[in-house]
A protein has these predicted regions:
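Catalytic phosphate/metal-binding cores of nucleic-acid and nucleotide-processing enzymes, i.e., regions
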Residues: 1-140
Length: 140
């Protein structure tokens, strides 16, 4: 057979498993954030709730244009303006997701300036955080 290449089944399985884990992580983070935003937009004590499109995959040209317009890597995922005048800022991660160095810098700057920001790993966690900020129970 000369030039034939045979791949080990375990090798192929591990590649597929890694790709599946990446996909599931993205889906899970998307679902957590989507569910939270749906909840937030139904609450009377939340005036405004919006997402920042930092996770959006764009062509290199589009990404360059977005950066020139002010897109800043590391900005948290969702901002909620509450009726008490405070912001509740949420970075969503899965159970295994990690905060990037850029995200840590931005989160630290927000905390240094007395902004309520949290990394939440579930919709429930984000809901509790926002309620704590609104009720004055979240102390920076």
């Amino acid at each position: 057979m000369g030039n034939a290449v045979y791949l080990d089944r375990d090798f192929l399985y591990n590649i597929r498993k890694k790709e599946l884990e990446k996909t599931m992580t993205l889906i899970d983070e998307f679902t957590i954030q989507k569910t939270f935003v749906e909840w937030a937009r139904k609450q009377d004590f939340i005036i405004l709730c919006f997402a920042v499109p930092n996770g959006f995959k764009a062509s290199s040209r589009a990404a360059l244009m977005m950066k020139r317009e002010g897109l800043l890597p590391g900005v948290p995922d969702v901002f909620c303006l509450l009726k008490n005048g405070k912001w509740a800022i949420v970075e969503f991660k899965t159970e295994i997701g990690k905060v990037s160095p850029q995200q840590k810098v931005i989160i630290d700057k927000l905390l240094d300036h007395k902004q309520a920001v949290a990394v939440c790993r579930s919709t429930r966690e984000a809901v509790l955080f926002v309620k704590q900020v609104y009720n004055g129970e979240f102390v920076i």
